[in-house]
Amino acid sequence: MEKEFVFGHQNPDTDAIGTAIAFSYLQNKLGYNTEAVALGEPNDETAYALKKFGFEAPRVIKEAAPEVDSVMLVDHNEPQQSVSDIDKVKVTHVVDHHRIMNFNTADPLYYRAEPVGCTSTIVWKMFNENDIEIPEKIAGIMLSAIISDTLLLKSPTTTDDDKEAVEALAKIAGVDYKDYGLAMLKAGTNINDKSEEELIDLDAKSFELNGHNVRVAQINVVDLPEALERKDAFLKAMEKASNDNDYDMFMLLITNILDSDSEALVVGSDETKSFFEKAFDKKLDDSEVKLPGVVSRKKQVVPPLTDAFNA
């Protein structure tokens, strides 16, 4: 059987990398020939999780077609978030927990999407449905993915399925998920050794909203005031990225993982900024606004932005 790649989105987070590893393992057990790869280097949080459970980081690819004819996608479906030559390969499987947008295929495929907090929660279900034992390492990296995406089960995206998966996977992995989870999340909050250009690209996704190219980036911190001391430099980096990549609006969500509050920085035209203000019913003050309780790009940012841009 010809090999297929399994990968998550660009600027991969712990879900994108961890779930690719787990889903590749599952598919190989089901008779496929797959390799988990990544569309970027792991961030500090993901690197912490990989090291904890004894994984090497998946190799990074820029294109898929030179090596494979078919691919499996996890944690994304929108082509602008995928590998650069996604139009040159056949997508045979998708497992995701996001909206479906701009996605179509020439052939039938396996597509599974559920409104849960993390893609690994769906893959955990698939292991159980197929009666395939989850190894300790795989359980650990899936647990890490769910903790990451749900902010230790505190995000509004968290479902009972996520909670059940965390309990089960922590038992297999042999860790206290609360202690491990907090340590892992904190490992991803050190922003002092990174430039503003790096930080706004670490966890960023592009969305097509009614003809507008909107970029939404997020960084997690434990000291929000300290992060905001770099506000001017962040805005400058966001302006440059917008000019270089034709973004109509760039939003940076800076989230305090300890109290689940965020501050947003926004650059764009007067029109796109007005859409932002309409989405959150708040006025920007010098390109900045407080967003109490907002921690999820998927559930609390993209839906209101979509509504505002489409109004």
From Swiss-Prot:
- What reaction(s) does this enzyme catalyze? diphosphate + H2O = 2 phosphate + H(+)
- Binding positions (Mn(2+) 2): D15, D75, H97, D149
Protein localization: Cytoplasm
Q: What InterPro entries would the database entry show?
A: DDH_dom, DHH_sf, DHHA2, DHHA2_dom_sf, Mn-dep_inorganic_PyrPase, Oligoribo/pAp-PDE_c-di-AMP_PDE
Location, primary (coarse class): cytoplasm
What protein name is recorded for this chain? Probable manganese-dependent inorganic pyrophosphatase
- Please tell me which top-level EC class this enzyme sits in: hydrolase
**Family according to the record:** Belongs to the PPase class C family.
- Organism listed in the record: Lactobacillus acidophilus (strain ATCC 700396 / NCK56 / N2 / NCFM)
Concerning SMART domains, the annotation shows: DHHA2
Cross-referenced SUPFAM superfamilies = DHH phosphoesterases (SSF64182)
Could you list this entry's UniProt keywords, alphabetically sorted: Cytoplasm, Hydrolase, Manganese, Metal-binding
Provide the binding site for Mn(2+) 1.
H9, D13, D75
Highest taxon in the source lineage: Bacteria
Enzyme Commission number(s):
3.6.1.1
Q: How is the cofactor bound?
A: Binds 2 manganese ions per subunit.
Please give an example of a GO cellular component term from this record. Answer: cytoplasm
- Output the Gene Ontology terms for molecular function: inorganic diphosphate phosphatase activity; manganese ion binding
**Cofactors demanded by this protein:** Mn(2+)
